[in-house]
Regions:
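Short, Lys/Arg-rich flexible segments
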Residues: 1-142
């Protein structure tokens, strides 16, 4: 029969607690970096051309919305919070009309121009979101 004797249990427990905190900090940082990557991509998608108010969409500028004032693009933000045992990065716009631009709306005379959902699809599909998360996590664990 073999036995393992730990004589410095308090030091071992302190070390594990410190490592646990390091993992939590790395997870928070990594989820935030992934959220910021999504925010950047969504802002890029929401910026396909510019024109003055009332001129309408500029043909040939791409599938996304044209920028008149930049309010939609500026309103896209990332918020990182901790809840229910996990970190959550919420990425999205704050202006009222953003949902109508993304999904369309029968009461809105404009055309739908998805910018947020395609941004997530692109970053997940090409592996960027995973790479950003993994690199950020590894950076904080050093």
């Amino acid at each position: 029969m073999s036995a393992i004797i730990v004589r410095n249990l308090s030091q071992v427990m302190n070390g594990l607690t410190a490592y646990d905190q390091q993992i939590m900090n790395a997870a928070e940082y990594a989820i935030g970096q992934a959220g910021f990557a999504l925010e950047r991509e969504a802002k890029k998608n929401a910026n396909t051309g510019t024109h003055k108010r009332g001129e309408g969409h500029i043909p040939g500028t791409g599938p996304g919305p044209n920028v008149v004032t930049g309010t939609l693009r500026r309103s896209i933000t990332t918020e990182v919070r901790y809840g229910f045992g996990s970190y959550i990065a919420t990425v999205g716009p704050t202006v009222e009309y953003a949902r109508a631009v993304e999904l369309g709306n029968p009461k809105w005379r404009g055309k739908r121009y998805p910018y947020l959902i395609p941004a997530a699809g692109t970053l997940i599909g090409n592996g960027t979101l995973s790479r950003v998360f993994n690199n950020a996590f590894a950076q904080r664990m050093r």
